[in-house]
Each structure stands twice: as C-alpha cells, then as structure tokens.
Curated annotation (Swiss-Prot):
Exists in a relatively unstructured form; binding to the other subunits (UreD, UreF and apourease) may induce correct protein folding. The presence of Zn2(+) or GTP does not alter the unfolded state. GO terms for cellular component: cytoplasm. One of its GO terms (molecular function) is zinc ion binding. It is found in: Cytoplasm. It comes from Sporosarcina pasteurii. One of its GO terms (biological process) is urea catabolic process. The gene is ureG. This is Urease accessory protein UreG. Coiled coil: none annotated. Homodimer; disulfide-linked. The physiological role of the disulfide bond has not been proven in vivo. UreD, UreF and UreG form a complex that acts as a GTP-hydrolysis-dependent molecular chaperone, activating the urease apoprotein by helping to assemble the nickel-containing metallocenter. Signal peptide: none annotated. Facilitates the functional incorporation of the urease nickel metallocenter. Binds a maximum of 4 Ni(2+) and 2 Zn(2+) ions per homodimer. The affinity for Zn(2+) is 10-fold higher than that for Ni(2+). This process requires GTP hydrolysis.
C-alpha cells in the first residue's frame, strides 16, 4: 500500500498541532502513522507531541527550517523529503505520514510532490472575513478546517455569515467548522481521509478514477 502524505498548514495558533495530536490519537489503532513537524528555530511542536505520548518517539521527527516556513514545504522541501525517507526506513509498514508546516500566512501551500493532499486550518478568532479574503490555503486546500468556533460570541463573528462565505470560497471543496480540542469536526475529517485518500469503500474502478 502506498504511504499517504497528508499536509497540515495554517497560520500560527490556528490549531495545527492540536489537529495532528487529535488525528494521531484517533487513527493510530487502525493505521501505522508517523508525524513530521516544521518549526523555524526549534522542535517545539515535535517535543510537545513526544511529551504527550501520542505516538512512539521514533515515529515523530521535528524539522528546523531556519527560514520562511512556506519555503520548506514548497520551494525547497529537501529537509522534509529527508525526514519522510528516514521514517520509511524506520517503519516499512507506514500508511499515513502527517506533515505539519510551520505557522504561515494565507498564501502558503504544499508542494504536490511533497504531499498527496493537505488540510488548511484557520480559526474564528482571526476574523469572520477570512473566507472572503481567500488565499490559496482557504480556496485550494483539499480540506479546510475552520477551528475554534466556540470563540465566535467573544470575537464578534457571525458563524452563519462565515459559513456562507466559506461555501462560496470553497466552490464545492470539503470543509468543516470545528472545535478540535473537543473533537467537534473530527469525524468529518477522518471520514474524508478514509474515503478520499485511503479510498476505503470504493471499488477498484472508482478508486482509479479518483487518482
């Protein structure tokens, strides 16, 4: 089986690492999983996941990009390719690698050579107009997670308006409104991973059409 490389991107503080943690906890009993995190000067996110005992330590690699976060996932992804190769050497049965980018702006996207698909994470506290502002992460990511919906009343965001704007921005692409700390929205993301990436429940003919 081909190892699925799933990117997770979004601005600083939007909930990327929490999503990685929650997905790993939910999927690790069913699939062989590993994680790569990207930080500019530290391995803070990797250390957090290790300390939380989400996965075995050897299944988590922290990459220090030393520069613009989006460069390491697009223009020069060599460090991440090396990390992928290292994980596959350690575990020859890997089914899913979650690859978290460093925090970046709305223009960041993953190289299609690096990942098979990517989830983009924004949060309500950044403003209800984020979907209208667009950007490649919002409009072209394979799945969009609008996180921290519980904060809407405190930051003056009308969720109904934000959802309508998201529908327009996504143009049919999948998304969910979530509070990932409480696992709200998690089921939709997992269902998408299983159906669209792992192609579970699809016939050979329909799976071929999806590739």
């Amino acid at each position: 089986m081909k190892t699925i490389h799933l990117g997770i991107g979004g601005p600083v503080g939007s909930g990327k690492t929490t999503l990685v943690k929650t997905l790993s906890e939910a999927l690790k009993e069913e699939y062989s999983i590993a994680v790569i995190t990207n930080d500019i000067y530290t391995r803070e996110d990797a250390n957090f996941l290790i300390n939380e005992n989400i996965l075995e330590k050897d299944r988590i690699i922290g990459v220090e990009t030393g520069g613009c976060p989006h460069t390491a996932i697009r223009e020069d992804a060599s460090m991440n390719f090396e990390a992928i190769e290292e994980l596959k050497n350690r575990f020859d049965d890997l089914e899913i690698i979650l690859l978290e980018s460093g925090g970046d702006n709305l223009s960041a996207t993953f190289s299609p050579e690096l990942v098979d698909a990517f989830i983009y994470v924004i949060d309500v506290s950044e403003g209800g107009d984020i979907p209208r502002k667009g950007g490649p992460g919002v409009t072209r990511s394979d799945f969009l997670m609008v996180n921290k919906t519980e904060l809407a009343p405190y930051v003056g965001v009308d969720l109904d308006t934000m959802k309508n704007d998201t529908i327009k921005a996504r143009n049919g692409r999948p998304f969910t409104f979530a509070n990932i700390k409480t696992k709200k929205g998690l089921d939709e993301i997992i269902a998408w991973i299983k159906s669209d990436l792992l192609l579970e429940g699809k016939t050979n003919e329909s799976a071929s059409e999806s590739k």
